[in-house]
């Protein structure tokens, strides 16, 4: 996705989009894991919402100019009242390998009933 880290990226826009996607995936993964641990975990707060100066680091959701980053939308989806999440422990499954992935369908404290 990112290519070699020994040289300057040839396409800075693509590099930025990929890095923002990875930031959002990390936050989404953490938030979903925390929600699956309800009520052992009381909740999660994003430490820093916005950036104090123009930069390309940190876990914030809004950039210095007030524009929402990719992570904003991934976090927003992870906090939806009805959001299915997989409990996966690795991303290195082999082609054709069988595995079981438990999932959770949290409903913001409301019981879930099949129709």
Each PLM stretch: what is its role?
Residues 115:
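Terminal RNA-binding accessory module
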């Amino acid at each position: 996705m990112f290519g070699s880290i020994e040289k300057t990226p040839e396409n800075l826009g693509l590099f930025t989009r990929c890095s923002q996607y990875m930031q959002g995936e990390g936050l989404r993964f953490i938030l979903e894991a925390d929600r699956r641990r309800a009520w052992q975990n009381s909740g999660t707060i994003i430490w820093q919402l916005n950036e104090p100066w123009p930069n390309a680091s940190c876990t914030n959701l809004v950039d210095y100019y007030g524009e929402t980053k990719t992570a904003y939308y991934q976090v927003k989806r992870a906090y939806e009242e009805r959001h299915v999440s997989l409990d996966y422990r690795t991303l290195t499954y082999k082609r054709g390998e069988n595995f079981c992935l438990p999932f959770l369908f949290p409903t913001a404290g409301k019981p879930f009933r099949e129709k």
